[in-house]
Amino acid sequence: MDSDNVDESVGMLDLKTKFDVFIENGDKNLEMDTGTRATTVPNTPTSDTKNSNSHSSVSPLRSFSRRSGTGSSVGSTAGKTNLSPQLLTPVRLNEGEHPLKDIPSANGSNVKSKSNNKSKRRSLIQPITAPISPDHHGNNFSSAGPVASETRKLSGHQRVISNTSMHSRRSSSQSIMNDVSQDGSLGISSLLQSLASKELELLETKQRIEDLRRQLASEENAYNQGALELKSLKEQVSSYLNPTTFGSNNNNHSIQIADGQDYVIDSTTNELIPTISRAESETKLNIPKSSNSISSGNSKIHSRALSNLSPKQEEGQEDEANESIWSKSLSMFTRLDQIIQQEVEKSLNWESSPEPTASTFAPITEEPGQYYDQNSNSFVRESSRQQNSHNSSEANDNSYSSRSIWNFVSEVKTGLLGKPDDELKGSKPQINTKTDSLEFSNASDDANDSPTIEYNIKQFKTRRKVTGDVEVENSSSKLRDVSIGDNVEEDDNENRIRQVNNRRKVVEMIDFN
């Protein structure tokens, strides 16, 4: 049956081509259309097929050079192999085998396998390849082979749509710019699309920047809270490490720590001391308000040093010792500087100005209340005399400041010698005008019990105010004698009394200046 069918097919080669014969035979036997399938036809049957089907004849292999060309039949010989240049349909060797079955040939090394052969037919559904990154956009299309060449024939608008559907806005905008640079100018639609993608990209960047700013602000707030918590923990740890400093008031100090109270660790005693205001420190240490706050920290140190040098005394005496010269502030040194400056300026002014003489002002008898100045040859009225008396009061104040400097010097000396203040309590400094020395007299004790303490400290060369009647009379002798007539009357007596009073005033004025 098979040989008859083969013979009939060979006879019909003149009327039809061999290709059409194979297709028709395959369609009739399998009842299916094999026009779209791509297979290879083995040129020679296998050895197994020869052994099993030795009685059956093998269908010959035919090759066609052209569509219209005539074909030549080739016998079924095992040594000859021919490859078909065109797509062929497999031949069914026997009734039990399927025509699409993969039958290996005897010379398998010379014949290509089914996986190596590719179909020359192209499907209408072509795959669209997308680049992995924007940088390799052009390389992926160039490596796509014939598919890339076919896609380049499409319009630019379709290519832009296919690319933007697979990529993000940034990659799509870059791909559009690459296409514009490669293919030249695109349409208005592609330009508008690139514009929109660029705007969206900028909006996303701006939103990302705002998110980073909000995140930065939240991180800063978290850092500040952490710093406050760390500070409170440090203060709590320091309070627990030094329980003797706080004593029974540990809870109160912990509350103050939570409220934000600041503490200072003393380097000498390693104690945690809470900071207090200036008013509280002045009230606790009994320091006047005019004093400087620097002395409040140094008072304890000096008091401890003095207590170590001196023998131990009772508690009442220690409290009195704390009120020594060292408990006072540094304003005392400032006061000393001011007093010395005043004394120096005053001494310089005295050295530069000439001393007034007794003949500068001479009383006259022409008009009461007037004086004659010999230097300026003019009259001086009562107003100028009052001004001179005001200057004399200022000189009195300066003399008082000269006494205050010696008071300060004596206090400093007693502090340096380490003598307690109770020895000098109630004592008032007095200036001995005869010896020019400074003396202290105790007013609380009797004169017999406590002797007078005398310090041979020389006084500055300052002019002293003379108020004694004896010195006034001696200085009045320097004035001119006024001739008084022999005839003494009541008017002359009144003038004489007025002249004596005026002389005393002039002498006092000269001494003050």
UniProtKB/Swiss-Prot annotation:
The keyword Coiled coil applies. Belongs to the TDA11 family. The keyword Disulfide bond does not apply. It is found in: Cytoplasm. Residues 62-76, 161-180 have a biased composition (Low complexity). It holds the Pfam family TDA11. Residues 36-60, 78-87, 349-362, 372-400, 429-450 have a biased composition (Polar residues). Keywords: Coiled coil, Cytoplasm. Its main location: cytoplasm. Residues 26-180, 347-400, 417-450 are annotated as: Disordered. It comes from the Eukaryota. InterPro entries: Tda11. This is Topoisomerase I damage affected protein 11. One of its GO terms (cellular component) is cytoplasm. Residues 190-240 form a coiled coil.
